[in-house]
Amino acid sequence: MVRNNNRRRQRTQRIVTTTTQTAPVPQQNVPKQPRRRRNRARRNRRQGRAMNMGALTRLSQPGLAFLKCAFAPPDFNTDPGKGIPDRFEGKVVTRKDVLNQSINFTANRDTFILIAPTPGVAYWVADVPAGTFPISTTTFNAVNFPGFNSMFGNAAASRSDQVSSFRYASMNVGIYPTSNLMQFAGSITVWKCPVKLSNVQFPVATTPATSALVHTLVGLDGVLAVGPDNFSESFIKGVFSQSVCNEPDFEFSDILEGIQTLPPANVTVATSGQPFNLAAGAEAVSGIVGWGNMDTIVIRVSAPTGAVNSAILKTWACLEYRPNPNAMLYQFGHDSPPCDEVALQEYRTVARSLPVAVIAAQNASMWERVKSIIKSSLAMASNVPGPIGIAASGLSGLSALFEGFGF
């Protein structure tokens, strides 16, 4: 029997599908459009660099040195700079006075320290019973900066032989405790008050009685109470504070002669209206040579019974003097720096941003805080159209180079 081993071939069926879609047309070699590059950001960066470089030629280095002198501590910078870059044009002598001194605070007493805008005088000090304020019998005594006599002479009648007027850029003070941690006690309180020098016609206690135009201080009542804006902390933490010019302009004040006390001799405290006395001591050592346009810093250190409180008191001030033509200092003078509106605006911005005082440990980072305020302010100002924005952008570029300039 023959088997049929032939397999049937299975025929493959083709399935044809009909569609209405058109077949894709082969693309021709069409050149592609170039990719758009984001030139706007790059253009802005180029413009920013151009503005910064352009501002480098217009903004003066004295403007930056002015900010550094006003706000940097003396252990960081002792350069007095070229002066205040405002619209004043004339010959000036710049000076940065610095005093470091050890001080002991009497137990069961409150010690008051006044950092006042008095050229050549570092601070005024007096102590009163604990828990009280100065009264009419209290006398604040002067402690001088080094070099007082070289600037203002040894006689009260020759204070203006070298310089005729002055103005402040800033005043600073720091108290750095050195007490044993097991022996200290007490607190530090800081506030500020505006004190001004005034000329008033007063009766003079002479025989026969007469009257005279004498100098007196107004605003000292602010020392007799802690202001609403104040700083209070434990003594061991210390304090750092500074005062700047709050007036619209940096105006010069005259150098005064023949004044050793306020109120003057033969004028009583009750007659003058002052709540207490200020005495500079012997005229060969010190004197009251003027009063600038700065808020006075008031520091009260309270030391209870049994406390052993000691500290290093450091105070410094940046001033600008107008030298007399026939004085030796005239040869060391220089022209006042050109006006730098942006630097002056940043001075005001920093002044508004700083607190009344901080603990002493934060003084080391104070210049870093000032730089951050300047950079933040200039970043906002650089968006302003016109020359102000251009100048701000340029100074912002300079502020980024502070480290390179030693700032």
Curated annotation (Swiss-Prot):
Pfam families: Peptidase_A6 (PF01829). InterPro entries: Peptidase_A6, Viral_coat. One of its GO terms (cellular component) is T=3 icosahedral viral capsid. Ca(2+) 3 binds at D161, D221. The keyword Disulfide bond applies. The active site is at D75. Ca(2+) 2 binds at D161, D221, G273. Keywords: Aspartyl protease, Calcium, Capsid protein, Disulfide bond, Hydrolase, Metal-binding, Protease, T=3 icosahedral capsid protein, Virion. Ca(2+) 5 binds at D249, E251. The record marks N363, A364 as: Cleavage. Ca(2+) 1 binds at D161. It is an enzyme of class 3 (hydrolase). GO terms for biological process: proteolysis. Its EC number is 3.4.23.44. It comes from the Viruses. Residues 1-12, 33-48 have a biased composition (Basic residues). SUPFAM superfamilies: Positive stranded ssRNA viruses. Residues 1-50 are annotated as: Disordered. Ca(2+) 4 binds at D221, G273. This is Capsid protein alpha. The gene is alpha.
